[in-house]
Structure formats: structure tokens, C-alpha cells
Regions:
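Catalytic cores of extracellular degradative/oxidative enzymes
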Residues: 73-87, 107-112
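A generic structural signal for short, solvent-exposed coil/turn residues
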Residues: 9, 65-66, 92, 233
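Residue-identity detector for glycine
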Residues: 11, 21, 34, 52, ...
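Domain-level detector of nuclease and nuclease-like folds
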Residues: 90-99, 103-256
Length: 256
């Protein structure tokens, strides 16, 4: 793929080309694809530091995902009030049923410095976080869903309204609400790129095709870009898969 072709979005899906053309995004290393591109991105977008798990969660709740004193969980849009200047954001969040979800689970490689990498951490309703556990992400048939989650509610029956706003779970898989599927995909791509030596490769590959599809159907939006910027203020790095909408297709997706 040539530089001129990439800059014209050749071989890139129409949705991603439009998104890239109308945003603050850029094309990272436009002459590279595949393993070489992954290697360069891993080197150039590694965090300068991670904050430690306690401080990291405090920053997550009070600064990164706090918008005018409101903190929302990724999977259900459940929200709580939390003063961004609080000296105890972890305690306050926990008391109101919010804890930290590792998109790439701790048991699959999010340990050591990676445990507190904010690009892999999101607020979540505690029960929903627990129900997801370390299951891979997947498209779940409605008839196979065991429980549905939205806001502070859990139900066993198929929703009759706003079905796309629900996250779903089975014993072996988890599907986030549709508006966050792309966010989840790009967090997984980030983690597997930056921490490939410790990330469980079988776990990644078991969901790779689904994540590639979600990256297309739920493209990067302004809120995701702003979140990446906020994290960079504390870790010194952006999520490159948010910075560049072509990156997934040039690394893990079109090369499958």
C-alpha cells in the first residue's frame, strides 16, 4: 500500500475514510502495514509511565471519565455523581456501585505496569463487571443471552425497547452495548499491541474477527478522541487506534 494510496484512503472502508477525513485524526506511519507497523506503534505509543492501580483509578474516576461531576459506566451508561476534586474518588465510586473494568482482563495479561494503564481501564457497574469476568467479547444471539444490562437494571428477558442500549452476557461471552463496541475493540487492539509479550494471544485471536467488525460499525467519535487526550496528560501516550482510524485495518483486520 503506497503513501499516495493511503492518503487517499485507498483500501480503507468508506466509514473509516469519512471519519478520518472529518476529524482531528492522522495516519500513523502510512508506508507501513502488518508486523512492521505493529512493532513501530508498540515502540512509539508505549506509555511514559503508568500511575499505579490506586492512583490510576482515582484519575480515571475524577479526571478521565468524569464530565461535569458525572461518572458513567462503559457497559450500561449507569451514572453517579462524583466531584472531580474529591480526595476519595475510589471510595465514593465504589459506594455507588462503580469499579474499574479491565477491557483486556488481568487474568489474560493485564498485570504489572499494564494493570493500571488507563487506556485499558473503564468505569463499570460492579455487578456487570463481575458478570463479564474474563470472557471474550462476541456477538451474542438474542435467544442465547442469559442477562441484559442497562443503566442500573438487569433482566433475563429480551428487551422490547432500546435493545441496542443493553449489554449482554452468556456463560462464555460478553457483548457491550452497540455504542461502545468500537471503543472496546480499540482498547483491545491497544493492549495487545503495547503488551504483546504478556497478553494471552489465544484470548485475542478468539475475538479478533468480531473486534475488527466492531471497529468498522462503531467508528471513533469525538468523545473517544477527547478521552485519549485526557489519558495522555497523565501517561504521556495516546491510544494509536483512536488517533488513526486506518490502523486496525492495516494491522489486525484486513491482513487476517
Amino acid at each position: 500500500m503506497t503513501l499516495s494510496c493511503l492518503l487517499a484512503f485507498c483500501g480503507v472502508s468508506p466509514m473509516i475514510a469519512e471519519n478520518l477525513g472529518n476529524s482531528q485524526q492522522k495516519v500513523i506511519q502510512p508506508d507501513l502495514v502488518g508486523a512492521k507497523l505493529i512493532e513501530v506503534v508498540a515502540r512509539e505509543y508505549a506509555p511514559d509511565q503508568t500511575l499505579g492501580y490506586r492512583k490510576g483509578r482515582d484519575i480515571l474516576y475524577s479526571k478521565v471519565d468524569n464530565h461535569d461531576g458525572i461518572l458513567k459506566g462503559i457497559y450500561t451508561d449507569y451514572s453517579i455523581e462524583l466531584d472531580p476534586n474529591s480526595t476519595e474518588p475510589r471510595r465514593i465510586a465504589y459506594q455507588q456501585d462503580i469499579n474499574a473494568e479491565h477491557i483486556y482482563p488481568q487474568s489474560k495479561g493485564a498485570t504489572g505496569l499494564a494493570k493500571s494503564d488507563l487506556h485499558n481501564l473503564y468505569p463499570s457497574r460492579i455487578y456487570v463487571n463481575s458478570r463479564r469476568g474474563n470472557s471474550p467479547f462476541a456477538e451474542i444471539e438474542d435467544s442465547q443471552t442469559e442477562d441484559w444490562f442497562r443503566l442500573d437494571q438487569t433482566q433475563e428477558t429480551i428487551p422490547t425497547t432500546a435493545i441496542n442500549e443493553y449489554s449482554e452476557v452468556t456463560k462464555t461471552a460478553f457483548e457491550p452495548r452497540e455504542s461502545k463496541e468500537g471503543d472496546v475493540a480499540r482498547a483491545v487492539f491497544y493492549f495487545y499491541t503495547i503488551y504483546k509479550r504478556q497478553a494471552d494471544a489465544r484470548f485475542f485471536k478468539s475475538q479478533q474477527e468480531t473486534l475488527c467488525q466492531w471497529n468498522l460499525t462503531d467508528p471513533v467519535d469525538a468523545g473517544e478522541i477527547e478521552r485519549s487526550h485526557r489519558i495522555a496528560e497523565y501517561q504521556g501516550n495516546e491510544n494509536p487506534f483512536v488517533v488513526d482510524s486506518t490502523l486496525a485495518e492495516r494491522t489486525y483486520c484486513f491482513l487476517q
